[in-house]
Design a protein with these regions (language model features):
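Acidic, PIN/NYN-like endoribonuclease modules and their adjacent C-terminal/linker elements
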Residues: 1-2, 98-130
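Alpha-helix capping/helix-boundary segments
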Residues: 9-10, 41, 73, 96-97, ...
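Residues that scaffold the ATP/ADP-binding catalytic core of kinase and kinase-like folds
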Residues: 12-13, 48, 77, 119, ...
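General small-molecule cofactor/ligand-binding pocket signal
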Residues: 36, 67, 124
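Short, well-structured N-terminal submotif of metal-dependent ribonuclease cores
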Residues: 1-37, 46-62, 130
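Generic structural signal for small/hydrophobic residues in well-ordered secondary structure
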Residues: 6-7, 45, 77, 101
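Structured helix-beta-strand junction loops
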Residues: 31-32, 63-64, 104, 119
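Active-site neighborhoods of divalent-metal-dependent phosphate/nucleic-acid chemistry enzymes
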Residues: 65-111
């Protein structure tokens, strides 16, 4: 199973503030679990990084497979926005991340499930490792 890691989880892993998320992150990479990210998440994290932290953030990105946004993802995200932007306040970034998960058959690892009312992909259920 591929796991698409949302920006909120990447921030927690980078900052190391949530031990449960960090433990789950360390347990995840395996031949059966590829860790994916969207360039949208890279943008969100890079925007807020301090210059002294850039190398550490690059190391985090190196542990991920960045899945490029293509036309299929763009169309799917556009469909999501047509359907959910007014009723659920879905924004473009969340539409693109959700579409990436759906197109690549990946489970989305996020704590912001309210941002993702779509039903054509699964969520990753973080195990309790404590």
């Amino acid at each position: 199973m591929n796991v698409l890691v949302d920006s909120d989880i990447l921030i927690e892993v980078f900052r190391g503030r949530d031990a449960a998320i960090v433990d789950a992150w360390r347990a995840l990479p395996s031949p059966s679990h590829a860790l994916l990210c969207s360039p949208v998440s890279i943008c969100e994290l890079w925007h807020g990084v301090r210059p002294a932290e850039q190398n550490a953030l690059e190391a985090l990105f190196a542990a991920l497979i960045c899945v490029p946004v293509n036309a299929e993802i763009g169309r799917r995200a556009g469909d999501y926005l047509k359907r959910y932007s007014k009723s659920h306040s879905v924004e473009i970034v969340d539409g693109l991340i959700a579409a990436t998960a759906a197109v690549h058959g990946a489970a989305l690892w996020t704590r912001n499930r309210k941002h993702y009312p779509m039903r054509d992909f699964d969520f990753y259920h973080q195990p309790d490792l404590r």
